[in-house]
Design a protein with these regions (language model features):
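Noncatalytic alpha-helical scaffold of FAD-dependent oxidoreductases
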Residues: 1-483
Length: 483
């Protein structure tokens, strides 16, 4: 639609004026991703407050051929929620759709709207004695709609799975305004094609997720957290298997961090204490949890059972020469101090440099091989690049990130593209994935064409054309009808 005033006037037919933003300064925070890599432009940002308003917008967009870019908390890392620079898009922010429509203790589920902040869902469930385990560094800003759109992972995937695994049902608004109600909390529903999972991870390119039914779990009442030094990734993988067996498969987190990353974290955040000195080659942050309150209380010998389990595991690791050093959190303050190291890792690398960030996954058995290959390939391109990888070892998801040499490097910006290619070359050697939990967005569209099975890519193109024949739903993301 060429006439801006006419377009805005049309939006006012089903949205309040206060829910339509066109001022450039007011729109600015929504037009750039949090890392400052992607910046776009838009005609307006709209903030619907109901599924009915989203439906009206989607009908209006189809009639007038308006590009729609859905956005949640704008915490994405691949530019999936940022429009292009044509200025032809309207950003659809779900941030004002925050109702919790249903909470069922009997069914262990809650039905929530797409704009609900993840951390607020944690609190809501815990206040009622249940647990929503999806846990990301961006939990204070990201929305459940965005988590679903990207099939987000996080630190608890090893026990509870990705967002897809936590979702029971969806409400989705299709282009043209039809509302598809798959919003059932049923645990079993074998009535035809699994359309729900088609939209999870589709990044708003097939329809707009407006609400979801999500699984809840028994609230963990006892935890034991340790930070452990290991010589290499292969040893860490071995320890994961041992901890799963020792704890009765109750490992909630198993996070890998190399010494190069840790040096940057402690440099950029000097108030965070360094618990292991000298720094080992790798540290693993590991946590086990129990829903049994007695596991966190002194037994007849005065010992805490869950801490005893962790201590016995650590002792076995020391005896086997697999663990070089370790610290065990004895209270919630110490636990948070250990988690602060991991949770500050993304911001630390951002402060230190303009990082080359990746989100790859490989089988656990290939993690060491991939790490070594990628490091070798990277140093062929840029010998002084620092590998600041971290990730969720339990599910094979590694953020193999790079930063420039300490003190800066004038060639860094020029070589970023070649560094990405070096990492992806190593990834191809171990049959890994270029996206584990961040999605494709606009950053990885071309890479996807090069690595996806051609038949699968053709099927994806057909599905996209079916739901969005004119290519106006989050254009330029994941795949387009022109591919």
């Amino acid at each position: 639609m060429d006439d801006m005033a006419t377009m805005i006037g049309g939006l006012s037919g089903f949205l309040d004026d206060k829910d339509i933003v066109t001022d450039r300064d007011d729109m600015a925070p929504f037009l750039t991703d949090w890392r400052g890599i992607f910046t776009g432009s838009a005609q307006a940002i709209v903030f619907p407050r109901s599924t009915e308003q989203v439906s009206a917008l989607m009908a209006y967009a189809q009639t007038h051929n308006i590009n729609i870019v859905p956005q949640g908390g704008n915490t994405g890392l691949v530019g999936g929620a940022i429009p292009d620079n044509t200025g032809s898009s309207v950003i659809l922010s779900l941030s004002r759709m925050t109702a919790i429509r249903d909470f069922s203790e009997a069914n262990n589920s809650m039905t929530v709207e797409a704009g609900c902040i993840l951390q607020e869902l944690h609190a809501y469930a815990e206040e009622r004695g249940l647990y929503f385990p999806l846990n990301l560094a961006a939990k204070g800003s990201c929305t459940i709609g965005g988590n679903l759109a990207t099939n987000a992972g996080g630190v608890n995937v090893v026990r509870y799975g990705n967002t897809r695994d936590l979702c029971l049902g969806l409400e989705v608004v299709l282009l043209g305004g039809r509302v598809m109600n798959l919003l059932t909390p049923l645990r079993k529903d074998n009535t035809g094609y699994d359309l729900k999972n088609l939209f999870i991870g589709s990044e708003g390119t097939l329809g707009i997720i407006t609400a979801a039914s999500m699984k809840l779990f028994a609230l963990p009442k006892a935890r034991s957290t340790a930070l452990v030094g290991v010589p290499d990734i292969e040893t860490a993988v071995t320890l994961l298997g041992k901890l799963q067996a020792a704890s009765g498969d109750s490992v909630e987190a198993f996070e890998l961090m190399p010494a190069t990353l840790l040096k940057v974290v402690f440099k950029q955040f000097p108030d965070i204490p360094c618990p292991l000195t000298p720094l080992p080659e790798f540290m693993v942050l590991m946590e086990i949890a129990s829903t049994n309150a007695s596991d966190g209380q002194p037994n007849e010998t005065g010992q805490i059972p869950i801490a005893e389990t962790m201590e016995a595991f650590l002792a076995d690791g020391f005896d086997a020469g697999q663990i070089s050093d370790a610290t065990l959190a004895r209270n919630d303050i110490q636990r948070q101090q250990l988690w602060d190291i991991r949770e500050h890792s993304p911001e630390a690398t951002k402060r230190e440099s303009t990082p080359v960030n990746t989100d790859v996954s490989v089988t656990r058995s290939q993690l060491q091989t991939f790490y070594d290959l990628a490091e070798k390939e990277v140093h062929k391109i840029h010998p002084t690049a620092r590998v600041c990888a971290y990730g969720h070892l339990g599910d094979g998801n590694l953020h193999f990130n790079l930063i420039e040499a300490d003190g800066g490097d004038p060639d860094w910006s020029e070589k970023r593209g070649a560094l990405f290619e070096a990492i992806y070359r190593a990834l191809a050697m171990v049959d890994g994935s270029i996206s584990a939990e961040h999605g494709i967005g606009q950053m990885k569209v071309e890479q996807l064409k090069g690595v996806k099975d051609p038949v699968a890519l053709d099927v994806m193109t057909t599905i996209k054309a079916l739901f969005d024949p004119t290519g106006i739903l989050n254009p330029g993301k994941v795949i387009t009808t022109q591919d």
